Amino acid sequence: MDIQDRVRLASLLSEYGALLTGRQREMLAMYVEMDMSLFEVAEECGVTRQAVLDAVRHGAEALQRYEDAVGKVALKDAVLAELDRLTAEDGSLKGKLGAVYEILEG
């Protein structure tokens, strides 16, 4: 998994992580957010590397299904990109839109 995949998965986990099982969420967070290896996660959770791999795969697939159905991350990314474009055109908007940035990035 490359860095872009990890960043994308971290965004999905942030938005939809509560919809996963506790075990999937825990293992996925260790793997993606804490940058632990499958082996390290397995040791920490007291399971096999294969169990972690299965949890990570199924969790990632579930997160993508949620995003495909809801589209919250894509919408947030599109709004942030548009705000960036607008503030690049008119720097004075940056201060006025600061609260919007905080809400979206928060």
Regions found by a protein language model. Give the residues of each.
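Short alpha-helical "recognition helix" segments of helix-turn-helix
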Residues: 41-42
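Helix-turn-helix/homeodomain-like alpha-helical modules used for DNA recognition
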Residues: 80-106
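Key DNA-contact positions within bacterial/archaeal DNA-binding proteins
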Residues: 50
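Residues within the DNA-recognition helix of helix-turn-helix
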Residues: 55-58
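C-terminal flanking helix
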Residues: 60-67
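Short amphipathic alpha-helical boundary/capping segments
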Residues: 11-20
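Short amphipathic alpha helix immediately N-terminal
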Residues: 22-34
